[in-house]
């Protein structure tokens, strides 16, 4: 049966969750060590300071700019500028970035390095390669940062006052060659003769007063209100300890009167003795629900406490402020003597407190010269750590708030990010840990992105971008709840884990369940609690918490696999009808549990579920053997027993006779109390039993029996319900006892029987007399002397009560030490019935103390031997109840003295683990358990016992010689002179290589010292699953902790061992791998300063095409990926069959080796298949082998002698080759000459117009500067999102601008509106069913009359309708796309895919790209496109434009080129706009312009700062010229227009004789005088009665039509003349092209340059295409290139380029459109891989851009290549991006109108859609056809109403 929709959704979400988690974090790697990181909160740009480098990265960590900052010649002692003559000690020195700060108001970046005494530079934030200020010759006043990289520098850029200048506050320690300044305030702008970075005033610095250097290490600087704060560590000398201090000063305090500092202490709650952490490592200030606070992480080095530790403390800033003010007040007004113990003067010594008036601190909030300053206090703030960790250090902290919940992200010393929730009550909870860069410390700069969605972390050489939450990866409410992520909660109505802001109804009660409140929607109770499977009724479910639901939420009940049905809701109770069908009851049960599922949104969202039992009374009677009535009446259901029919059935509400109701099982007829309870085997026994409640039982015919032993006997009835029967002789050999449950039948029906007896066998397991007499007396077993065995007493006539004497068969051990004290075990028979029977034991003449704990009846006695004075061998004697037993001669015990003589080896590691071999005599005395070996009281575990002893040493606290001691049975035996020496553990100094493939087998050379001490080495890998992967693999199979031991190694000497790396699990990224070298008992991590040993995934190889490689040259080539990631050329091996293939080259993707000259035999020869007798090609990397196919040598031989073959074959072949080469050379030379000739001509033409291009380009740039200023003033007129999508989606539709989707009008009578809208919303829900929508689309596309235009329109309507759920829209598009791709691949023409938009999905892709790239157009690519459009428009309008023929002098299009030379002159006219009070505006026009053209240019100039849609139309204004006192209205056509026969010429300014400098007045009219589209039907004033054939012209009058009688030859000449004219004017095309070239290049670079940020949608879709190509095994790069080209450049960019009005509020004239078409065609040519050879017949546009096309093609190739190399965009990131677009813009679209339009298609093809839905099983299950019918019923009058 098909899965329900919610289950499919769940599976999809599960896949999404896995893909979300499987992605690796985005990262950037630096070649040098990283120092600092800063993030621009507005642009998202990331700035990174490193050693010798600065980086400007995009938000996704792609490099935008890279600046080299070192190394340079310097010495810490020298003063810059560094000159060799002045600084002889200067050497090439690295530049460590000491300070990296942003100044967003100034759009600049502050960076200071360690070179040149720590001077700083200002750089542009937009481009860090632009240095705004740098001065290295100002001397000490410009030394800002420390020039010692070990001394930290912190800073803060702020303003001294709200409107004050920007300054830099700096805090740094005092390095050995620093200037001693600790705290300073620096200028950022020149002021009052001071340069940037000089001190703000002469007093704004504090210098160190200490003699020692580097006593301060600054941690952080921050601001709060009008104060600046510093956090730093200070090393006190007396006593020597570290203090963490917080310093504060006023921003606007040029003299530092306000400086005050105090201690900060962070208490460790886990260590009351050493209760405070010592050093602050990182600090961050954040505002959370509890207010603004300082969050600081502290560490403890662990030297005194046995290990490192760290804690997080919180210091609320209001408490900081209170404490500082209290300290100030105490110093100002307190006693002087008392203040000396608390207060001090930082940097200078003692301070004089006291003597000031009360209130001085309030009167002088920023201190004063007469008050003590600077002020330090040892009385500071103390906080208890809200989080503490042992074993590691916390190295970074940043804090944020989500819905007033405080979240801290903490970096650790082992390369992880801890996610911690800080509760309002002061407690904390770590809810996640992200392994960022294992065993690499997280650096202090931990930053959040501006939108708080990402976290940037930095290690030694990498920057990582991590999501702050992964809510969408938790696919169930339980997973969401268990994550405990404060960002996440379960969005009930959407059935997914989201942030609160992403849940549409989060503010409604019960709709967003916060993860930390640990609640999910659950069914807490059901009434009734169970139901008979044969009953019908309602089930009332108590649901908590039940979200508030509306009628539209459609709550459904689903019982098991039954169809869902609507549920009713009453308060917090959901009422469901019982299902019509119930699964069968499982065998052995009386009920079946059926899952009740509550679903929302037509079954697409799972709410909760509950197991509900349906019971079956017919099965209840057979649950207990032989007790049908009791089983029925005693179960937990309401079943009852029918005495008449002997059946179990459901209870009836009415009283009935002959019924035993539920829980009245005592009333059942039954038989019980058998006597006797035990029955001997092989003996007939009389059994009596009782009856009860037998009134309805016919006791006259009763039978008793057992199905197990297959017997049945008649029952005899006695008085008082007593019965009896006689058993036959029963036997069963398998056991001592056998429980029997006897049945009782009456007329074939079972009566309840509790007759349980036990059948027993006396002989079983009782082989001797003692064992027999020890049996349970109830069995009445006796030892029968005559039979010599144990039997039932009635079966024996010769019973004895006494047993024979004991028999001893063997002892263990057979030897013992003279000191005794060991246990001896005596085995035999008749050794007594109980322990008390054993009276005395003698071993070798010595008493042996009985040990009752080891006694076993009759078979075993254990005793402890006593000491013996001398060695002796003797027997064993046992006294059992006065009967003596003696051991036979071969069972003897020997007293002997063990004597150890020597031990090997004599030394081993301190960690232990050495196996010692002890030699001596009689060492095998006793048993292994009796021997104990110690080394200086440290146990040596005995592993081997015999003539030699072996033991494994334990760990010793210190190295040295120790004595070996051996104990036997507690007594020490002498071992004179035997000692063992513990040596220091071996040490690993280096290893190489640093990595291995997961399959292992790589030789790892480990060097160090002390290896000769070791006996056994092993390379051990501990694979600990990462927490995130544990959750990820919960469905696919949990990951377990794995420990792998590699025992293969070669020992060389004391300093070198070579290991073979062991194989580890195949997913190394899923585990935290710890690699150790185990040396006996010592384990050392395989980690040195060079790095940590790591595993990488195995390489992949491509198999040979067809499985066989033809060997035609000397090398075999194999392809793959990651081949050299953990393998070198020297290590790699390859084989051809049984022989080696000599390795020649190994790169990341290629392997070359030289095979044997003669074909070797295969490794595994096949007998029958001759093809398989070819040798295999095998690649071996370490332990793993890859068989890539077989190698076929060319083994053909000829009987013809070689001396004949060479002349006969070679001579003709050489002749043919020579002739062919000559012919080919001639043809190539001819084509090359033609190509070079054309190219030369083109270059010559370009050269001839180059000077003109330069001049015109310069003029254009000057004029475009005004345009640019207008753009900056008014902004680029980008359309709003709705208008943009309307134009992109619907302009191609047949109704154009009048399309109802654009107008947004839906005319519905008010009386019908609620019904219609409700139905449309239901239709929207139906569209959100994937099954319905796919069927809907397939059905429409199968209709013949569903044209390509209709598909385009339908897809656009669908885009608008689903815009609110773009993630779902994308899923639908992907599904349809996979189907489309399958069709093309099956048809073997994949290159044709996406060439047009002939399917719905192709248009959906166009719309999807348009949606996803809108913001990119708006932010990035829009400006160069707009400037290109304006440049073309400006250049076209500089020359004549024929208003009738739409041709221009300056154009890129040869068909739109104005052929004739037209005389014209530029004019500048003054224009006054009437009634607007604007001064006269100069406007440039041409004297050949028509009046309409003049109007357009005037409007363009006057209203240039307004969007085009706000401009007046040319036909709505009147142009008036006032040459003198008179006024003349100018128009295109009037009575003065020039006439020539049938032709009338349009008036121009020249016609009216308007001169340069003339004044024109523009005024508006009420009624349009001329239609707007007059350009198409130019001023046709056709008065049929006066002139039938009036024709108009402007600049060039068309020639009369050629007579029909003209010959074809004449026509050919005309064509040639036209072509000649075009070529003549080609220079003009080149001139325009050269003028516009920069704008064209800028646009191409903005779209195709890899340096620009690529929209995530492009990366996402291109990766999708790559994946599908790989899936379908499409290796042809041309095909993939075509797919990408058709999906983005040709589908989107060409469309936007040809139609700028789609994105901008502009009007595109035909002459501008013609030039745009040429550029668009060039863009299209650049995207094709086909090479176009130029000839004289080539189109002029291809000739125009012949030189540039190769550059553009490379840009496209590089663009595609760059995208492929980008970090993958995960499904989660894409869905988040799409969700943001949905939220931002959906409300502005005409969704309701789109739904109505879509419904028209449903109405048109109603029957076909219904049939399709009814034939689809999934649609049937969800009742989609029925739901559509309901919607159609609601909308049936809609068409007529509309």
From Swiss-Prot:
Which pairs of Cys residues are joined through disulfide bonds in the record? 78-87, 112-120, 250-366, 266-313, 331-353, 471-488, 477-520, 480-497, 491-503, 557-576
A Gene Ontology cellular-component term: collagen-containing extracellular matrix
Give residue ranges on the Extracellular side: 20-1201
Give glycosylation sites per the record. Answer: 127, 242, 393, 451, 798, 919, 1053, 1072
> What residues does the record give for site: Cleavage?
1168-1169
Q: Which residues lie on this side of the membrane: Cytoplasmic?
A: 1223-1842
Question: When this gene is knocked out, what is seen?
Answer: Embryonic and perinatal lethality, due to defects in brain and neural tube development. Mice exhibit abnormal cortical layering and defective migration and differentiation of several subtypes of cortical neurons. Cranial neural folds fail to converge in most embryos, leading to an open neural tube and exencephaly. Likewise, mice exhibit defects in the embryonic development of the cerebellum and the olfactory bulb.
The GO terms this record gives for MF are: semaphorin receptor activity; transmembrane signaling receptor activity
- Tissues with expression: Detected in macrophages from spleen and bone marrow (at protein level). Detected in granule cells in the developing cerebellum, dentate gyrus and olfactory bulb. Expressed in neurons and glia in the developing hippocampus.
IPT/TIG domain sequence ranges: 806-895, 898-982, 986-1095
Q: What does this protein do?
A: Cell surface receptor for SEMA4C, SEMA4D and SEMA4G that plays an important role in cell-cell signaling. Plays a role in glutamatergic synapse development and is required for SEMA4A-mediated excitatory synapse development. Binding to class 4 semaphorins promotes downstream activation of RHOA and phosphorylation of ERBB2 at 'Tyr-1248'. Also acts as a cell surface receptor for angiogenin (ANG); promoting ANG endocytosis and translocation to the cytoplasm or nucleus.
> What is the recorded name of this protein?
Plexin-B2
This chain's source organism reads: Mus musculus (Mouse)
Name of encoding gene: Plxnb2
